[in-house]
Amino acid sequence: ASDGKANLHQGAVGVGLCLRTGRALRAVQFGNPLRHHPDTGLDLYDLKVPHWDTLLTLAASCYEMSGLGYIGTDMVLDKFRGPMLLELNARPGLAIQIANGRGLVPNLKTIEKLGQVKMNVEQRVNFAKDHFGIFDE
């Protein structure tokens, strides 16, 4: 199992998610495909992240907090407080691309084509869902 590791390069389980729905698309550990959680045996493809829209809104609001154009957000779902921001990463790991099954370059090119268009948090969330969601339903 991941032995409590939170980073993919250290052995954490990574689950690629559809940005539109929060449903699992695929999973990896140590860069290899994985279907079942190594500790619980649960089918990772059955995962649907609760509070998905709140998590996306929280992540999209980090732009104003940080002023950075590209960041990684680490979030947790607290039993009592719900979605919470754990940390921001100015240089997030890129191994999640393996779990997502697609690279970032096409997404970044789509964003670059926008130029200096200003969007509020809700518009950014909707843009990401519409352009980067993998339509799994």
Named regions from a protein language model:
Residues D3-D78:
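A long amphipathic alpha-helix within ATP-dependent nucleotide-binding catalytic cores
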Residues H36-T54, E64, L77-E137:
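C-terminal active-site "lid" helix and adjoining low-complexity regulatory extension at the edge
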